Amino acid sequence: MKRIARFEKVTKEQFCEGYRDCFGEDGDAVYETLTLPRRATAGSAGYDFCTPRALTLAPGETVKIPTGIRVWMEDGWVLKIYPRSGLGFKYRLQLNNTVGIIDSDYYHASNEGHIFVKLTNDSVSYTHLRAHETPEHL
């Protein structure tokens, strides 16, 4: 199988800048624990991104999450970020832009192509996300 893309971590400096912007805290220790997106099984339709820290979202709350991840792709390709089916079905967590679109040239952006995800808890209950796990693992 020909590889057309690869995930990488952004630099520590870039991650810490995004982490401070989102959470108002230092992200040095968190950076060391970042994991690249991976497929849960051989038959998985896509790669799972994990939150770099534990989060609790109140009903109606929105959070912007720095993933610490960038992706190199061949020209002409696109990375699409969809919520796992359980995010909406079980937890009512939704991506704010419905589908995230990462262009192949975003890798070269001034922020190193750092991918951020913005989620909203559209339920009437608090939702807890554990660090380094997808919501399906709760």
Where are these regions (language model features)?
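Non-catalytic terminal segments and appended small domains
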Residues: 1-135
